[in-house]
């Protein structure tokens, strides 16, 4: 039961944080590139890498990794925004978004793990 509470608590704060950051960026960004989701996802990749690389206890992994990072990052919005770019025939932005999200996300997860392991 305590494990579920840790995940739920982390998830609550992760979702609220993503909502706040996403809305802040969307009000200020008028380009076709979905910068809010991109920054949220690469930040989340780095932080999750750092958490895991740091070797935190299972409780902290549940609270921060599964709960907070699980709700903070958003795979579904990334996919939806990618499809929307395709539907608008914005192919160059689509390719940039797709490739940058995967390449930078993996790089940031790696860096987070390395820095967390120091």
Swiss-Prot record:
The chain crosses the membrane at residues 1-21, 33-53, 55-75, 93-113. Keywords: Cell membrane, Ion channel, Ion transport, Membrane, Metal-binding, Sodium, Transmembrane, Transmembrane helix, Transport. One of its GO terms (biological process) is cellular detoxification of fluoride. One of its GO terms (molecular function) is metal ion binding. It catalyses: fluoride(in) = fluoride(out). Na(+) binds at residues 70, 73. It is a multi-pass membrane protein. Na(+) is not transported, but it plays an essential structural role and its presence is essential for fluoride channel function. It is found in: Cell membrane. GO terms for cellular component: plasma membrane. HAMAP family: FluC. Belongs to the fluoride channel Fluc/FEX (TC 1.A.43) family. Fluoride-specific ion channel. Important for reducing fluoride concentration in the cell, thus reducing its toxicity. This is Fluoride-specific ion channel FluC 2.
């Amino acid at each position: 039961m305590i494990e579920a509470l840790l995940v739920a608590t982390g998830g609550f704060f992760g979702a609220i944080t993503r909502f706040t950051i996403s809305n802040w960026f969307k009000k200020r960004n008028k380009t076709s590139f979905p910068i809010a989701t991109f920054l949220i996802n690469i930040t989340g990749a780095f932080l999750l890498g750092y958490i895991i690389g740091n070797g935190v206890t299972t409780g902290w992994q549940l609270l921060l990794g599964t709960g907070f990072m699980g709700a903070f990052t958003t795979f579904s919005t990334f996919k939806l925004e990618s499809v929307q770019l395709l539907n608008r025939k914005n192919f160059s932005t689509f390719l940039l978004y797709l490739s940058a999200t995967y390449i930078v996300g993996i790089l940031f997860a790696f860096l987070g793990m390395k820095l967390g392991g120091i």
